[in-house]
Every structure is written in structure tokens, then in C-alpha cells.
């Protein structure tokens, strides 16, 4: 007789294999059709706002793993908040101006920039940027990131540019914008000034030279034959030398060696003596740096003086204590030079070519004249030593080529004037990790004024006009007019029209009596673009608020977007644009190495999604400690895919056993769920509480671990395992079966919501298969709440103690299996020899057979001797024997009652009764 039809086996349309690369795009099409983003916003309208403001990625190239990590975590946060009592809009953005797009056109697309006007070239830049945005948008959406993708903010859009001009105008009105000539980071490879945020440090091999500057007028302090010794790693700046700086409080020694007198800091004398191999050194006298002030030296090979000056920046960390000073090539040099009235000599052009102000080196690339300068110094007897060192040196973050300090006329945003307010804003912000506060505090404390001008074409113009006498013209009237022009026509209008056509109608100025005006040709630093987004996006969009609750980007943005946004917002608003700042580390390969084409270790998000699916990638993001550097590789992703498989199987089992369950009809009231069912609901409540804590603290690794452990430990290894006999074997409405189903319904509903921010595709797929749910998507529901359960301590204590005993029993069964005493656990009969405490526990626990998944359990009498074959544990000894009787064809338990019912000779009595009472029409 076939009893299969009397078994209630799992049934579900939820497949074992997710086939995510194929199923996810279909799911995303469904989200698009139903406009899930709009539905979520409408559902949560009226709730308190939670705004995560998107730091705009650069619109160039395919997304990489850093992009994926960043966008996915943002999605975790926004999805969770929208299911947890908040209105959480997410407006993605793109950063679109700057050199990389210019380079992409001229180098990759072979655009001849010189053959067209700036305005036409900028139009090509805009077209390229928009193409890149469309490509990246599809890739970000493929990650499952939910947002207002068809109404993003883009820094090249007219409205954004118009607001950026207003930010500039407000800062200018307050006196925070000025033009000045001073040394700035200059990139010869980009032919433009750079801000500190655009500098990266790499090792570079440089010449290291010691040079003697002969005293011309010792002022009675130094002998006329003495020479001050300087040390530098930039010989190419010697032609620009105008002075030597010493520290006023340091002691300097005048020493005689080899028939010559030299001056070095006393604290560095031993070091210099070793470096220059001086012998028979005699200290003739010591003086303070203050006494050396205004002593006159001669330039080694030009017919001009080099003045000795006092400066607090001189240290004893390296060199000689006498610092070669070229005001056109260093910030400290510039400051001390201004104090002493020196010229700002900078004999180098935009491309790094020496000019006629450096006689003998004109027309040479600056880095090539190091050797020429050294040879010249040697020829005149001024070179004391030539060596080479490898040191950390600033490079252009885009071109990866070295940068220089070069004095040029640039536009600056004053940091000094608002430094106090900036530091207060940093202190008022919540920083995660906490070290972020120290990091940005120190940057703000130490940074100079921000060079905001760039000598490029593709960017937002600096909205300044010039009168006939060269005076800068920027006023509320001109700013308002230019802003309105940009709002109507875009910033390209600046390059399409003459200055007079960009000024308000009838505009006059005493600086232009003839009515002639010119306009600024420089553009703004791209960090000013994205740094203005709090104005152009948070304040201007009706669906967002200022300040944002959270900025979340990579740790490189402390010097970038976090910094520029803070500067512009404090300047015009007096407060930071964010309440909190969260940062993440970088994505490395599986061995912790940086990904690079040369190493062949690059993991590409698009490839991962084609092979494994976006939810696997998202689960990987949840599985790493993202605040530090995280690792990814094919093998790591395979491990994550295995975890996903287990999670999916858990969902499938739960759904499969709800195929005949209607929560409105079949659910067992909560107060009637006792024993193991009540215990599991307590565990679910604890999980819910921990998951909320993890999400709220942005600790997604904790969320991942708690969820995974619940699925594998509480469910797969225990509750689901012990449920099978009841779910499959008992009749449909058996109270115990309905109890299991009720709990499983509660569990699957809660788990689906709890994991929805991390696995949105899978969660919606599960949601569709849960009986009785009304919402079209789990995204349109709220998170389960953790209840404050009272009176559960005793229940938890009982079941936790039982689980310890169960673990011992399972070990004993495993040993018996290995020793061939039994095959499957249902072939076992157990005799337990508990201690007093364990006895009370076991006697108070119903259904031991099902809890241990065996055919028979006996608790030995007190005082019974423990047989030698029993396995001894801390609280119980376990004797495993082969169960006596026959195996029931239907439930697979071994029983002496098999055949007791003549109609069903292969069934145990319990199964025979179930079949007779409930399945007479089937068999």
C-alpha cells in the first residue's frame, strides 16, 4: 500500500536555487513597473525625516567594488530607516566636472580640443558625462539600490550650477573669497592648481644636496669667510632662492674644518659632520638664530643677495637648521618672505618649464634641471655633497605625476577666518568611527586657505568680472544675475557670451568708466561643486531637508567631500551640513593587497552579479567589517554564496511547511504556544532586538552574524529538525502541527522583513510565497518590533539547559553511528542517566523522542548503575542502543506496535490511527 499521499510533505513555488543572475533583473523590472521608490515615499510621508545625502561618485567609467560597497551600505541604511518609522528619501548624485572627463575626450576619444571653442569642447564634455551617468545608473540599479534614479542631482545641471554660484556669492559677500598670489600645489601634468584634497603621496627618488651660501655681510656676527649650509631635495628651486631662514631661538655653531668656516644648527652639527665627512672640526663660536637676522649671503651662482631671516617653522628634524628659502615655491617660504619684503620669484610656467627668470635654465623642464643646477653648484664650489633619497612626495591624484609648489595668482576661500566655527562644527557632529572627529579636527586646524580656482575648461566658472583698471567686480547684483543666467542657460553661457552680456542690463562701475569689462577665465575646484550640494540639493529639493542626518563615504573623503562640504556650509550657514558622518575603508583583494590590473586581482561588481547575483554581493558587504579595509576574492564570494544557500534553504523549508496554513484560520493563539514553541518565539524576539541594534549602529556585520546564526543554529539544527516528524506525519489540524506552523509563520514573516534591507530581491521573492500577506512587497511593510517580554527568564533557562543536554545526546548518537550501533538516529533507543538537576529538567520536558529525533527515550531510575557502554557527560550519561521492533513504513520510527493494526501491517499504531481517522478516502 502507498502511504505517500497521507504525508504532508513541504510544497512551495519558492525554488531551491535562486538563479539570481536571471531572476533579479526580472524582479527589478517589477519594481520599476510598480514604482517602488514612489510607493515607499508615499507610505512613509509624514514620518520624521532621515536623510542620507549621497556623496556624488565621479561620472567616468564602470563602477568598481568600492562603489558597490558604498552604494550597497547606503541602501542598507535607507531601506532599514524607511521600515523603521522614518521617511527616508534617497537622491543619488553625480560629480561631473573636472580633468578626467577632459582627458577621456582628448586621449581616449581623440578630440582635438584646440580645433574648437571652449564652449563647444564643454558641450562634448557634458555629453560624455551624461553617457557615463546613464551607464553607472544601470549598474547601481542592478545592485538593487533603491532611490530616485530618474531624478538624481547632477553637478552639471543648470539648477545645481545656479545654486553653486549663490554659495560663492554668499561667501564672497562675507569676505571669505579673495584673490592672491601665493604658492599652491601645481600640477604641470594637469597644467592647473590643485587643492590639498587632490594630492596623494607616493615614494619618489630625489637628489639630496648640501650647499654653501657664502656670507657677504656678517654684520659683525659672522666672519666674512663663513658660509651657511643648507640642505634641499629640490635643486631645481635654487635659481629661485632669495633667502635662508633660521629659527630665532635655536643655537647655531660657527665651525672651522678643511680651511673653511660653516654655520649649522648646533643640534644638527653631529649629523652634518657625518653627512659631509668633516674632520678636525673646531667650534669657533655659537650664536642664536636671532643674532643671524638680516645677515647677507650671496646666491651661489647669480649676482644677487640671499638674506638670512628668522622663521618659526625651522626644526631640527633633518637638514642643517638653515633652510633654503624660495618664496615662490613654498608656503612657509612665502610667509617669511612676505614678512621680510622679498619678491615672489617663480621662474617656472604652467607646464613646468623654466622661464627667463632662471638664466641658464630657460626652456628646460623643471625636473630635468636638477642635474644642471648640481653641476653649476659644483663648478662654483658651493656643492658640499650630492646624494639621493627616496621619500614620500606629493603627486597629482588624477595623473599620478609629481606636483610642485608654484606661486600663481589664484582664488582662495579663507579657512583662517572661519577656523574656530569649523572646529566647533566638527565637535557638534557625531563621528563613526570616533577617530573621524580627530582626523577632521586636525585637518581643519592645520589646513591653509583653500585654493578654489583651476586653469581648466570643464567646470563651473568663477563668477567674477574685472574693471578697466583690473579691479575685481563681484556683488550681490552680479551674482544674482549670473545665477539666473546659469539657471536658464547653464554655465556654458559664460563661455558663449562677452562679459558685458553676462552683467545685469545697464550695469556700471567706477572701475570701468568706458563701460568695458572682462571676465574671469578660471573655473572652480570640483570639490567646490560637490561641496555645495547641501545648498543645491538638501535645501533646494522639496523631498530633502538640511542638515542631512548622515554623510557616508570612504575614509579618503575626510580630506575631500566631508571637508569641502563643511567649509562651504559653515561659511554660509554657520553649521555643518551633516548631523553625523560615517566612513568606510577600501576594498582589497583576498590577501589584503590593493587591486590592480598588473596583479590581475581585480574583482568587478558587474562580473560578480552576472555569475552570482546582486544579493550575493550585498551579503558579502554585510559580512565584512567595512569601517576597516575589507577583502574580496572569488573564494571569499563562494563562501558567502554558501551562506546564502543556507539562508535560502531555511526560507524554503519554512515556506514549504506553510502550504496548507492560513494565518487567519489556523494560527494558534500566542498564549497557547508553550514549551519549545514559546522558547523559539523568545529567541526570535531576541534576534529582532539584536538586528535593530545592529542596523541602528550601522554594524551590519553583527546583523549578518545574528541572522546567519539564527538560521543555522536555532532553526536548521534545532527547531526545523524536530518539526519534521510532526509536520509531515500528523494530520493537517493536529494541534502540535498547527503550533509549529504558527511559529514558522511568525518566524518567516519576521525574518523576511529583518533581512529585506540586505537581500531585497530574495526577501521580496520570499514575501510573495508567504500565505496571507497583503502588501505587494516586503518593502511596503515595517520592521517587526522587539517586545519587552516578561516572565520569560524561567522559560529561557529551562530550554538553554535542555539544549546543553541535547548537544550531549547528539554527540552520543554520533559516536554510536560511527561505531555502527545505529544508522539514522531514528534507529536509536536512549537510556538517560541524569544528575538531580538534569532529571528534573528532563522530566519537565514533553516529547523527548521528537526533541532528540529517536524512536525511544527512557530516563533511568535514581540510583541505577550507569553501564560501561554509556557515554558520560557533565550532567547526564547516555546509553545508545538499537531500538527494538520494526521500522514503520510511514514515519520511519522503530516500534513494537508495527503491525498491530491488521489493515495497516507495515505501520506503527500511531500512524495506523492517523491514516484510519484522516485518510480513509486516500488508502
UniProtKB/Swiss-Prot annotation:
**InterPro entries xrefs:** aa-tRNA-synth_I_CS, aa-tRNA-synth_Ia, Anticodon_Ile_BEm, Ile-tRNA-ligase, Ile-tRNA-ligase_type1, Ile-tRNA_ligase, M/V/L/I-tRNA-synth_anticd-bd, Rossmann-like_a/b/a_fold
| Gene Ontology terms, MF aspect | aminoacyl-tRNA deacylase activity; ATP binding; isoleucine-tRNA ligase activity; tRNA binding; zinc ion binding
The residues listed in the UniProt record as binding L-isoleucyl-5'-AMP, with positions renumbered to this chain, are 553
Q: Which co-factor is required?
A: Zn(2+)
Question: Where is the protein found, in the record's own terms?
Answer: Cytoplasm
- EC number, as in UniProt: 6.1.1.5
Instruction: Specify where it is mainly localized.
Output: cytoplasm
Short name of one Pfam family: zf-FPG_IleRS
Gene Ontology biological-process entries: isoleucyl-tRNA aminoacylation
Top-rank taxon, per record: Bacteria
Q: Which residues are listed for ATP binding in this entry?
A: 597
What's the top EC group for this one? ligase
Reaction(s) catalyzed by this protein? tRNA(Ile) + L-isoleucine + ATP = L-isoleucyl-tRNA(Ile) + AMP + diphosphate
Cellular component GO terms, alphabetical: cytosol
Q: Where does Zn(2+) bind?
A: 888, 891, 908, 911
Instruction: State the span of motif ('HIGH' region).
Output: 57-67
Keywords from UniProt, A to Z, are: Aminoacyl-tRNA synthetase, ATP-binding, Cytoplasm, Ligase, Metal-binding, Nucleotide-binding, Protein biosynthesis, Zinc
- Location of motif 'KMSKS' region in this chain is 594-598
The record's comment on cofactor binding reads: Binds 1 zinc ion per subunit.
Give the domain section of the comments. Answer: IleRS has two distinct active sites: one for aminoacylation and one for editing. The misactivated valine is translocated from the active site to the editing site, which sterically excludes the correctly activated isoleucine. The single editing site contains two valyl binding pockets, one specific for each substrate (Val-AMP or Val-tRNA(Ile)).
Q: Which PANTHER family does the protein's record reference?
A: ISOLEUCINE--TRNA LIGASE, MITOCHONDRIAL, SOLEUCYL-TRNA SYNTHETASE
- Quaternary structure note: Monomer.
Q: What's this chain's function?
A: Catalyzes the attachment of isoleucine to tRNA(Ile). As IleRS can inadvertently accommodate and process structurally similar amino acids such as valine, to avoid such errors it has two additional distinct tRNA(Ile)-dependent editing activities. One activity is designated as 'pretransfer' editing and involves the hydrolysis of activated Val-AMP. The other activity is designated 'posttransfer' editing and involves deacylation of mischarged Val-tRNA(Ile).
Instruction: State the family it belongs to.
Output: Belongs to the class-I aminoacyl-tRNA synthetase family. IleS type 1 subfamily.
Q: Which HAMAP family match?
A: Ile_tRNA_synth_type1
| Name of this chain's protein | Isoleucine--tRNA ligase
